[in-house]
Amino acid sequence: MEYVIENTKTTSGTREIPMSDEVYACFQRIIENRKKVKTEPMIDGKCGFLYLDKNDMPMVALHWEKYFQHICKKYNSIYKVQMPKVTPHVCRHTFCFNMAKSGMNPKTLQYLMGHSDIGVTMNTYTHIGYD
């Protein structure tokens, strides 16, 4: 498998995302508890990836899709009320929807989601209107 770090689709896709102290601490724990590797993988001059696969390479979208499928399958084998298909992109939609519903400023949400057009944030992701 060849690893390539691609640019974002739009310039607004490259952004700094604020995080709380709790989120920062969570990322620190992930890094501290991550399996120690002999050589840190470097892809296109970038290193410090949070999650590595069994070959000590960065986890990619396909890894996460499979991971989510496994979780849903295991959950559904245990519980009567079935969990619908969940993907990382569904989590993105859910985040956007919940932030909109909680009253986050639409322009702030647009920035966080990396949308160049506020219409994408308002129509595609939120499924609710701002009053």
Walk through the language-model features, giving the residues of each.
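Active-site micro-motifs of SAM-dependent methyltransferase domains
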Residues: 25, 97, 127-130
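Ser/Thr-centric signal marking residues that sit
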Residues: 8-11, 87, 94, 108, ...
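Catalytic-site neighborhood detector that most strongly recognizes the C-terminal catalytic loop/helix
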Residues: 113-131
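DNA/chromatin major-groove-contacting recognition/catalytic segments
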Residues: 3-5, 102, 127-131
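Conserved tyrosine-mediated DNA breakage-rejoining catalytic core shared by Y-recombinases
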Residues: 1-42
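Generic alpha-helical structural context detector
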Residues: 28-29, 69, 123
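Short, basic (Lys/Arg/His-rich) helix/loop patches that form interaction surfaces
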Residues: 17, 33-42, 46-49, 54-111, ...
